[in-house]
């Protein structure tokens, strides 16, 4: 009986310990993403100074990568603001941005572009549903 009581005590602290580990890992990830975001800003400024032969696709790609870093950082901030909960809509924003980046980079095949556009349509539809009042518990 004594052993069973000790297991209950240990298992009651287990989720708390895992939550702390997750929080520390997300803080570290946020710091690393912030460093990469600043690196992307510096690289973007250097690309603007160069009036060379760089294609506009590379410049747009760097802007979209900046927004991907930014969205991940915002998602981590929202995680802590919303009592350790990731809002679904931020994952959808990241998915849409990633597909737009893919369209900018790989625009050779018309069939692939059509499939990417369909994927964006599905994600926007999911975003519309996720932003409805019925699904948004954070507005209450």
From Swiss-Prot:
It comes from the Bacteria. GO terms for biological process: cellular response to phosphate starvation. InterPro entries: P_starv_induced_PsiE (IPR009315), P_starv_induced_PsiE-like (IPR020948). The chain crosses the membrane at residues 16-36, 57-77, 85-105, 110-130. One of its GO terms (cellular component) is plasma membrane. Keywords: Cell membrane, Membrane, Transmembrane, Transmembrane helix. The keyword Transmembrane applies. It is a multi-pass membrane protein. It is found in: Cell membrane. HAMAP family: PsiE (MF_01048). Belongs to the PsiE family. This is Protein PsiE homolog. The lineage of its organism: Bacteria, Bacillati, Bacillota, Bacilli, Bacillales. The gene is psiE.
């Amino acid at each position: 009986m004594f052993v069973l009581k000790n297991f209950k005590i240990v298992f009651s602290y287990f989720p708390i310990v895992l939550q702390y580990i997750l929080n520390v890992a997300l803080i570290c990830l946020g710091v690393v993403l912030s460093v990469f975001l600043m690196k992307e800003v510096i690289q973007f400024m250097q690309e603007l100074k160069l009036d060379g032969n760089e294609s506009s696709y590379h410049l747009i790609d760097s802007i979209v990568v900046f927004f991907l870093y930014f969205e991940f950082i915002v998602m981590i901030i929202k995680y802590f603001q919303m009592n350790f909960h990731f809002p679904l809509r931020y994952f959808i924003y990241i998915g849409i941005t990633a597909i737009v980046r893919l369209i900018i980079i790989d625009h050779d095949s018309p069939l692939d572009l059509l499939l990417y556009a369909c994927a964006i349509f599905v994600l926007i539809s999911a975003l519309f549903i996720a932003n409805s009042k019925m699904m948004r518990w954070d507005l209450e």
